[in-house]
Amino acid sequence: MFDLKEKLRTLPEKPGVYMMRNDKNEIIYVGKAISLKNRVRQYFQSSKNHPPKVKAMVSHIVTFEYIVTDTELEALILECNLIKENRPKYNVLLRDDKTYPYIKITTNEEYPRILKTRKVIKDKAKYFGPYTNIGALNETLDVIHTIYPIRTCNKNIERMIANKERPCLNYHIKKCIGPCTGLVTKEEYHQMIHDIILFLDGKEDELVRKIEEKMKAAAISMDFENAARYRDQIIALNNIVEKQKIVSVAEQDQDVIAMAKNEGNTWIQVFFIRKGKLVQREHFILKDTEDDSNQEIIASFLKQFYSGATFVPKEILIEESVEDLNVLEEWLSGKRGNKVSIKVPQKGDKKELLDMVKKNALMTMEQATTVIQLEKEKTEDTLIELAQLLDLEEVPYRIESYDISNIQGVESVGSMVVFEGGKSKNKDYRRFKIKTVKGPNDYASLEEIITRRFKRGLEETQDIIEQSLEVSEGKFAIFPDLIMVDGGFGQVTSVKKALHSLNLNIPVCGMIKDDRHRTKGLVYEGEELSIEKTSHLFRLITKIQDEVHRFAITYHRSLRKKTTLQSILEEIPGVGEARRKALMIHFGSIDKIKNATVEELLEVQGMNRKVAENIVEYLNK
């Protein structure tokens, strides 16, 4: 039994990190403290001065844990890692890192590639980002590939050269320099990668000077073809440099951070200044921050943003000072490798620069808020139209859609997607493996997954009532206002049969397609309803139908791929269950295993040379 008084009494007066847990043993808050004893006790003293958010959090605390650290810096690093890993409900959170893309240069490969990724891992590759503007990221990648035709494939270049394999189409249309031909040296290829890194580091001026020297040397030696290529590269780079605004005469690297608050959310604007030029800007949204002070918001942003950032500048400008500023500077200096200063300018050029970022933060917030409001009004009108079409008593705020996917009855799966207020709610999506139905029977499969979903929901609802829990704490406890199934009258009948067996009365309609497998309309209460194809309602139905189909197909493919991989690897001598699992964990896909060299395979846990050679020989027959 958890004894709160005893645990509070024995808290150490040392720096560390504390984790608050609820009755499900979930971490709902992570914090750091100079003195764990003083900080943690504050939560359980008189709540008069606590803001509503803290009061709500404390009401859910069932137990807490703490980790003692030697220094405040260690506590800060641990806090950042725990917040990133657990994403606690009551911490100020940036959107999940996985949703922000990065540019990745695979410098861990002999012939590196440049990729777009949403995951930063310790694999000796070089990362740039995060980017919140996908359009700007894609434009950057287009420019890079235009100037530097590096490879985009994941083929084994050394093997292609050794076997004299034919290069792909990209080589013939001059979109790839073709390292697989053996006509390009590693030094030449790596020089291109070095130039790309200079470009992404914001050192375009230095890069242009280097290319100008190459152009002059090529012209002197009468290599006019390469001289022309270098000239085109310089023109492309100068076009980018001209777009960059000079904001500081001092050629230094700075990040300038300002914020704007509205309707419980905080909009953060970051200007990235490199060598005195504004090279990029990004904005971020922190939700549900109405009870958090500006200092708390800024501190949380700095910790989370720079935990995932691939570059830390020498100077960071912010609007208000934050608690533990010195510790933050020490942490960032460690990440950068030399001194980093966090400053709050009060006057002069730096204050003017911060004011400019503040204006942009306000403008971005106002524009986005207007768009969100217009979108909300349009969606509300669309849902009202749907309610009128189906003669529903209530506007269907929450819609659940279901689909079955199988190929000749093999690996049948069901999927459930959720839309709330006309927008997909990905965290409520669910997948079901069909357990009781043999062979291709969509009707029986639908009946099974609907029964399982709502039976589980009823059980959770009972637990919530008995234990006085919040409805949101159940995975299936929230029921829809409308069910939309991918299919016609037969599918609708199966769903209604399952609901009837559980004494549930939820409206059900089917989304039907035409002969070309495109959205056609709805079926409801035995009647087929046509919808104007140019209407917002038609677009919403199409969106829901496409999404539930995509989700089902994706799940089905992943299961098939695992089965295929398993069967292929099972046939290779020396590859048992443990090695199959180790290969999958290390490489992630059959394609990557197929393209791996013997040396790369030897990096897999439990692998020996003979088995590695068997794998290469078998997969490349």
UniProtKB/Swiss-Prot annotation:
Tell me the InterPro entries matching this sequence: DisA/LigA_HHH (IPR041663), GIY-YIG_endonuc (IPR000305), GIY-YIG_endonuc_sf (IPR035901), GIY-YIG_UvrC_Cho (IPR047296), Hlx-hairpin-Hlx_DNA-bd_motif (IPR003583), RuvA_2-like (IPR010994), UVR_dom (IPR001943), UVR_dom_sf (IPR036876)
An annotated GO cellular component: excinuclease repair complex
Q: Where in the cell is it found?
A: Cytoplasm
List the source organism: Alkaliphilus oremlandii (strain OhILAs) (Clostridium oremlandii (strain OhILAs))
| Top-level taxon of origin | Bacteria
A Gene Ontology molecular function term for this protein is: DNA binding
Role this protein plays? The UvrABC repair system catalyzes the recognition and processing of DNA lesions. UvrC both incises the 5' and 3' sides of the lesion. The N-terminal half is responsible for the 3' incision and the C-terminal half is responsible for the 5' incision.
Matches recorded under PROSITE patterns: GIY_YIG, UVR, UVRC
Which residues belong to any copy of the UVR domain?
A: 205-240
Q: Name one Pfam family in it.
A: GIY-YIG
| GO biological process, alphabetically ordered | nucleotide-excision repair; SOS response
The protein in question is named UvrABC system protein C
The residue ranges of the GIY-YIG domain are 13-92
Assembly and oligomerization: Interacts with UvrB in an incision complex.
Positions in coiled-coil regions: none
Q: What is the lineage of its organism?
A: Bacteria, Bacillati, Bacillota, Clostridia, Peptostreptococcales
UniProtKB keywords? Cytoplasm, DNA damage, DNA excision, DNA repair, Excision nuclease, SOS response
The record's family statement is: Belongs to the UvrC family.
